[in-house]
Amino acid sequence: MAKDALLVLSGGMDSTTMLWDYAGSIAAAVTFQYGSNHNIREAECARWNCEQLGIEWIEIDLSFMGKHFKSSLLDGADAIPEGNYDDENMRSTVVPFRNGIMLAVAAGLAESRGLKAVMIANHSGDHAIYPDCRPEFVSSMGKAIADGTYEHLELRAPYTGMTKGEIACRGKELGVDYSHTYSCYKGGEHHCGKCGTCVERREALEFAGITLDND
């Protein structure tokens, strides 16, 4: 299998699972620093997993987003609401058009390196509150990337129809060490267990029968 893809890698459960799942086709992974509460912790995990697989890790600064965009995810731990992802208050964590911006940069980076595709690890649980994770967006962005690059790059999003629990099950099969992933929107040393992404993380791990000590 040719290593022809660039993965957008946050360091969370989903993109880390995709890194291990598709390591045979991933030439490099890119992590974006955009000023979120959990960026630093996520990036540490992203780099660690790339090192384990011998995949090149690239870090790109998008700090202008943290300075100019409105989102509780950019406003410090105290601004993060608690509850499930489908709760109305979790909409405050949306960073406007985050995936669109990251995919555009990733597409330019991939074409500059002579790669054929960009990969993103959105999943069905994201669709409720994140417009730029929905199948319609992925389809439209994929067309824009193909039309806007000389080599007609492909946008691959193989987890779009999967739940986070199903992704965790796949990670378990692959032997992914989820203690080297980070999800909490508050950005603390340990997962708070109360914000939407922590709740979803816990439910996914339980679904897959995975127990993490001191998470």
What does each model-identified segment do?
Residues 1-175:
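ATP-dependent adenylation/nucleotidyltransferase module used to activate substrates
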Residues 81, 174-178, 202-206:
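A polyampholytic, Gly/Pro-enriched intrinsically disordered region
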Residues 104, 180-203:
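Local cysteine-cluster metal-coordination motifs and their immediate loop/turn environment
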Residues 149, 206-209:
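Short amphipathic alpha-helical interaction/hinge segments
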Residues 187-188, 209-215:
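Short cysteine/histidine-rich metal-coordination sites, predominantly Zn2+-binding motifs
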